[in-house]
Amino acid sequence: MAELSRRRFTLAGLGAAGLGIAATDLVVGGGVAAAAPVPDAGADQSWPFLTQGFGPVSVAPGDRRYPDLLLRGYNRRFTGNPDAVKLVGSTSQVVQAVNEAVAAGKRVTVRGGGHCLENFVDDPDVRVVIDLSEMRAVYFDATMNAFAVEGGAILSQVYRTLDLGWGVTIPGGSCPSVGVGGHITGGGYGVLSRLYGLVADNLYAVEVVVVDAFGMARSVIATSSANDPNRDLWWAHAGGGGGNFGIVTRFWLRSPGATGTDPTKLLPPTPGGIMITTLFWDWSQLDEAAFTTLVTNFGTWHEQNSAPGAAANQLWASLIAIRQGKGGVIVRAQVDPTVTGTQQMLTDFAAAMTRNVAAAPAASTTGNLPWLYTTTTSASEVAGVFGIPSLLLRSKTKGAYHKKGYTPDQLRTVYRYLTSPSYTYASGLMGLFSFGGKVNSFSPTTTAVPHRDSVMLASFSNYWSDAADETRQLQWVRELYRDVYATTGGVPVPNGVTDGNYVNWPDVDLADPAWNTSSAPWSTIYYKDNYARLQQIKAARDPRDIFHHALSVRPH
């Protein structure tokens, strides 16, 4: 029982951390504070008492700080060797660093939180990395009537400052160390998205450093206002993905439809607490039929309870199935128990999950947990769950949007991959996460995020530490994904059942004809019909293709 309890605890943490697959630093908070003025777009707009005196700092090979900055990357499969890492403290310093790199003919990219799953930053061709980690201020900007978040902030900082200062939050991810830069520009999905949409749906403006046709960098402020001549740049950064158009040094957040100037009313309210129900099955309890029934139950519930405005959007759930030998199957659901009816919702959800599943799970329900503490400190990092030191963590993640659940044939395939004794490494998994609700109330063209009728997000991941295992570890997750989506060319093409993949789960295999044999290119899988507009914006805003990576938007 001690081992079962330990496993249930670590797997429950992974249920939350899976969204990041993705320590609170000094931030600025307080009540309705005096806002930082917003000067001309080209001026330095950073908070002086956080950034004055810092930067720019250039760290090159041979500097003792250089290895630390390279290790900010999440995935040890990739390690860059740039000529310099430029630590910056202001927008003007970013402009300067970009200008220097472009003038020298050096490929430049940006790092925020460091959680990119592919080698978009840690690419051997990248010669200059602009590191935004010292630009992390969070404050209310009365001039913009919105909350400003600098591009180097991480989610835990944002949640803490918004909650302690104004009692509001954003519907972002549950891995606290994820950076806002990639997260928001890729859409920004999290536990509260069924209630409040994606973070990109709550994005009012961005400040972006772009490079013109003459190779000159400058900063531009782009808002969602219909009469803003730079609105296209806002739209592209509301889900178009990071590393495509420029470097975002600041985001301004305000919920659509919010009115007035009271900052406590301009973003979603912080939940009153969190109550979590956890159901755990060991693999010894689940044969193929029971596993198929359980996962089908999860999909059916989401098909029936994910429409915009549905009461059940108060509940968010995950199902994590980890390979035999390391864990089992855990279903985790959470609500705000201070909302009337939600505790009964948890009970009803648990009954729906266990229907016709012969084996009874180990079940537990927490009391009312503090929202901020639980959100920022209790989500387990993947490395800790699997016992892999973070310095050695190597991974591969593949994803899919689902409008409907899986077929029995697909689930038999998943079961075989998760339980077959022919594969002995135990840290592979499938994860399913609640989607829909408020997200699906927006048009596919409101922002650059086109996926507006799915009810679940699925992920298939593998984690390991030894570089010598690379080939077989990649083969396992690649073949699992290919076989699950075998009837559609090995990928989740947009159709009546699946709807492509989440931009923040980049997968270069989608651009490889060896693994994507469908007629849908990677750009359709990620962007659907919005890709053509993104290409137009790319051509206009980054005509020299300064900002690019393996899956970046291509100019016309």
In which residue ranges do the predicted regions lie?
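N-terminal secretory signal peptides and thylakoid transit peptides that target proteins
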Residues: M1-A17
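C-terminal region of N-terminal signal peptides and the immediate post-cleavage residues
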Residues: I21-A41
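Cofactor-binding catalytic cores of oxidoreductases
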Residues: P39, A43-Y74, G113, E118-V121, ...
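Glycine-rich N-terminal segment of FAD-binding domains in flavoprotein oxidoreductases
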Residues: D63, Y74-M135
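Glycine-/small-residue-rich beta-strand-loop submotif within the FAD-binding core of flavoenzymes
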Residues: R76, S92, D122-E150, V191, ...
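Structural signature of FAD isoalloxazine-binding scaffolds in flavoprotein oxidoreductases
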Residues: L87, E118-R136, R194-D212, I247-R250, ...
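Short, structural beta-strand-to-alpha-helix junction motif
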Residues: N145-V149, A153-D163, S177-V180, P370
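FAD-binding subdomain of flavoenzyme oxidoreductases
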Residues: G172, S177-W281
